[in-house]
Amino acid sequence: MKKTPSRLFPTYEVGSLPKLPARTSALEGREVADDEMQQLKRLGLKYGVDSAGAEEVIARLQKEKRKPASEERKQLLDFNALLNLRIQEKSGIDFVYDGEARRSEMYRHVVQQVEGFEDLPEMIRSQEEQSYRKSVCVAEPKLKLGALSVLVEEEFAFAENNALHKVKVPLNDPYMIAVMSDNRHYTRIARKQFPEDVWKQEYQAKREFTLALAKDIIRPQVEAVVALGASWIQLDLPCATVNVEHLPIVVEGVNAVVEGIPASFSLHFCYPRRNSLTKKNGYELLYPHVLHLDQRVRHFSLELANADDYESDLAVFAQYNTERKFDLGIGVIDITLGRHREGLYEKPQLVRERILRAAEVLKDPSLVYVAPDCGLRQLKLDRCIRLYEIMVEGAELARRG
């Protein structure tokens, strides 16, 4: 029996945690530094995760100067995943996952398992220190044989079987993959359909690409985890407002993923700083489009601690609550690298104030969930742990009033 979540202001993680350095070094065939091994042992002991197996694998790999075989790799990933679960649970987080311990990177993790994609040689800088290798869609995308096991089945089964708290599964959104890829295949088709209209070419190509990804790449992953027992699935939409003219495509893509599936869905949005000509800004950009989301989409996870105007951004959702209510996971922890480099942390009291302000603006405390702004993979693990603790402490203070 998994722990029952808090009834007021439940907490959750958004998705990623940084990979354990010892695990990463071992997987890549590099020497594991003494401080990396000490961290592995220290965290294993602190969070009650037996590190003996992982230590034995690493010692053997170091002695033989090689990369791990399949079973050795699995041992290291299992240890990292279980450690991430226990870190979240012992920090007091209500809904947990494995910190995406088995995923190399949110984009590459998926496209490497898709036929119809070819890699570009250069790395693309996305934001701050993050970069990724872009792929080109050259044919209709289809999952490779065995892809579901690699992408989600093994990962979810391990998390579900080992988690002591309720599980929320983060997955990619199809539009995100479409934006981050070179859309050569569908652009070629659209140019033939609309030879004189560049805007229609771009729109139709993006729409067809997104829907193909939704139906043939993302939806099968959702169906797989639901078949294994998943009840709450989060789709990550960091690129949702890159082009506000494409918001109908975003909504159509999400609906193609979730339609008819017996689960509850949430969407994670990064803060929508305006990238197209419009009088709207912030989360106002999402409306009225999100009103047309499938009814299975009941929850939004929002980057807010790093937003332009905390109350104004929340007021948008209150304004539309008469038409459709969404539960809101409010970002109360700013995870930007600038704060990380300066060693800055929110105070639990500030987290409390943000939560209570959200409850006041929305006029319904039951709509408010509590989360970091985004996934934490770009930070140091010790900092992530402290941020979780601050978030949970602030939520408890808010429950007291």
Predicted regions and their residues:
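Domain-level signal for soluble alpha/beta catalytic cores
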Residues: M1-G401
